[in-house]
Amino acid sequence: MNARNEQLTSRQQEILDFIRQTVESEGRPPTRAEVCSAFGFKSPNAAETHLRALAAKGAILLEEGRARGIRLAEALGLPLVGRVAAGNPILAAEHVEARIQFDPALFSPRADYLLRVRGMSMRDAGILDGDLIAVHRSHEARNGQVVVARIDDDVTVKTLRRNGPIVELLPANPDFDPIVVDTRSAALELEGIMVGLIRTDH
């Protein structure tokens, strides 16, 4: 299973963690110079490249012309993703309906976004049409975990069962059939794992 574009590289994750730690310990974001110093970058351009990549992936917001113009996107609330257009990253701006004030650390592992569930295929797992699931971005998951998966540009929420190259995405409703994917010949990309459920008024 391949990570999609919005997955962070290990260095980007380290920089994001550094920004979080600085905000939590000092009550302010780091400057670009502090990012350079912390990671041993010889040029501010190297830090800027990583910061812009983080901004493009929706992890931070950059404010031009400010020394401390780095803002954690999560500080504005978790992005609520509605319908996902074919071929686009799940956190593309056009998919974000709103930002909802939830502390991502309430979930373990921490949530990266909320996804609005469409349909009743997971009804017997207590996941109903219109519910919001908290999702931790990951391209790895264990058997039995509820995952957000992309198959041929369609995004689905199902329980994962993997047997070698054969992956089954199992519904929790007898009215729906499992989705079986042979990863040797078909594309299956894991977008994340469900880490929480928020019931909405239906």
Swiss-Prot record:
PANTHER family associated with the record: LEXA REPRESSOR, LEXA REPRESSOR-RELATED
Source domain of life: Bacteria
Protein encoded by which gene: lexA
Keywords noted in UniProt: Autocatalytic cleavage, DNA damage, DNA repair, DNA replication, DNA-binding, Hydrolase, Repressor, SOS response, Transcription, Transcription regulation
GO MF, one example: serine-type endopeptidase activity
First-level EC class: hydrolase
EC number from the UniProt entry: 3.4.21.88
Protein's UniProt name: LexA repressor
Family under the similarity heading: Belongs to the peptidase S24 family.
UniProt keyword DNA damage present: yes
